[in-house]
């Protein structure tokens, strides 16, 4: 079993779904199980989730799971309940984040994503911001990183 997560800037210019899907295929080619954690906070997360869904259709005999990991409860889960229930296998708000102030919850969630994954698939071109901080954290933790070209 392999677990992976994603990091990228909120704004992505053009689709990168195929690049992400290609990276995921290298992970699953010799494995039967792939668990993917996505943050759901920007365009890169959306493209990442789409790539995982494409892979699920392409490899129906493999166990590929897509989990949305949120930093805190959000109203959009109730407003768009059907979308979330059909788009993700699981929706998780880690218990460790319950006591964290909401302004610090997103960086804490990003660290949780890295801590609970074997791989980080990232597309980062700026040396600041949450995605960059997540990449640096993954590097310090010795995680395997697949850095995609923009």
Describe the residue ranges of each PLM region.
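Acidic/glycine-enriched connector segments
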Residues: 1-150
């Amino acid at each position: 079993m392999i677990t992976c997560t994603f990091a990228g800037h909120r704004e992505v210019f053009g689709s990168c779904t195929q690049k992400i899907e290609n990276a995921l295929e290298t992970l699953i080619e010799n494995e039967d199980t792939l668990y993917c954690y996505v943050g759901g906070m920007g365009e890169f997360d959306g493209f990442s989730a789409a790539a995982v869904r494409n892979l699920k259709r392409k490899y129906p005999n493999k166990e590929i799971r897509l989990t949305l990991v949120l930093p805190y409860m959000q109203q959009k889960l109730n407003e768009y309940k059907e979308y979330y229930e059909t788009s993700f296998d699981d929706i998780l708000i880690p218990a460790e984040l319950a006591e964290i102030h909401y302004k610090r919850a997103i960086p804490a969630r990003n660290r949780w994503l890295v801590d609970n994954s074997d791989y980080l698939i990232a597309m980062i071109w700026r040396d600041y911001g949450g995605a960059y901080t997540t990449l640096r954290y993954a590097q310090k933790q010795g995680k395997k990183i697949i850095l995609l070209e923009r």
